[in-house]
């Protein structure tokens, strides 16, 4: 059985922290699906196609990374794509408490799917897509915080 991990997020935009988590997880899994969740009630800064293109460029050197988008529950998308693991990055204890609650609900809905946490590298722990969007909105230079495939 292949070890398939599902790495969900809005990736609006994808950051160095996201990229670092996926690259560090590559040796652990046969395949990592970077999955852009489509949420119609969320106002994204960047169109879905743009985000998907950036993620594909970022991981163009990684044949075991697949980029998709999905609607609905993450756990349902995991089942659809035969992923037995949900990959999450943790920047701090607040992230852990939030992610733990979601993982417990996912476990209740589908006990065969495990959530795997990787601590964010300290260099990227202060970065979030929200902060990066704020830098961009205020015409600052966000490039140092963006994944390698992103050019603004």
Predicted regions located by residue number:
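Nucleotidyltransferase catalytic core that binds NTPs
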Residues: 1-152
């Amino acid at each position: 059985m292949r070890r398939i991990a599902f790495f969900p997020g809005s990736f609006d935009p994808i950051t160095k922290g996201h990229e670092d988590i996926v690259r560090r997880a590559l040796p652990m899994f046969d395949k990592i699906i970077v999955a852009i969740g489509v949420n119609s009630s969320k106002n994204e800064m960047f169109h879905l196609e743009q985000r998907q293109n950036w993620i594909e460029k970022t991981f163009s050197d990684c044949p075991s990374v697949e980029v998709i988008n999905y609607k609905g529950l993450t756990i349902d998308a995991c089942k659809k794509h035969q992923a037995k693991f949900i990959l999450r990055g943790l920047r701090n204890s607040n992230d852990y408490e939030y992610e733990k609650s979601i993982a417990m609900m996912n476990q209740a809905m589908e006990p065969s799917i495990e959530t795997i946490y990787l601590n964010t590298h300290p260099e990227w722990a202060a970065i979030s897509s929200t902060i990066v969007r704020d830098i961009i909105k205020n015409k600052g230079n966000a490039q140092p915080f963006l994944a390698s495939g992103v050019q603004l």
